[in-house]
Amino acid sequence: MDILSLGWAALMTMFTFSLALTVWARNGF
């Protein structure tokens, strides 16, 4: 795996986690 695909995967993971956390916080609090 090269650095570009690794960085892209990390970016998508961070974005998905951030979005899920925002939705969870909004519904939870």
Curated annotation (Swiss-Prot):
Protein function: Component of the cytochrome b6-f complex, which mediates electron transfer between photosystem II (PSII) and photosystem I (PSI), cyclic electron flow around PSI, and state transitions.
Mode of membrane association: Single-pass membrane protein
Encoding gene (name): petN
The protein's name: Cytochrome b6-f complex subunit 8
Keywords assigned by UniProt, alphabetized: Chloroplast, Electron transport, Membrane, Photosynthesis, Plastid, Thylakoid, Transmembrane, Transmembrane helix, Transport
Principal location class: plastid
GO cellular component: a single term: cytochrome b6f complex
GO molecular function per UniProt: electron transporter, transferring electrons within cytochrome b6/f complex of photosystem II activity
Family: Belongs to the PetN family.
Compartment list: Plastid, Chloroplast thylakoid membrane
Transmembrane regions listed in the UniProt entry: 3-23
Biological processes annotated in GO: cytochrome complex assembly; photosynthesis
Quaternary context: The 4 large subunits of the cytochrome b6-f complex are cytochrome b6, subunit IV (17 kDa polypeptide, PetD), cytochrome f and the Rieske protein, while the 4 small subunits are PetG, PetL, PetM and PetN. The complex functions as a dimer.
Originating organism: Phaeodactylum tricornutum (strain CCAP 1055/1)
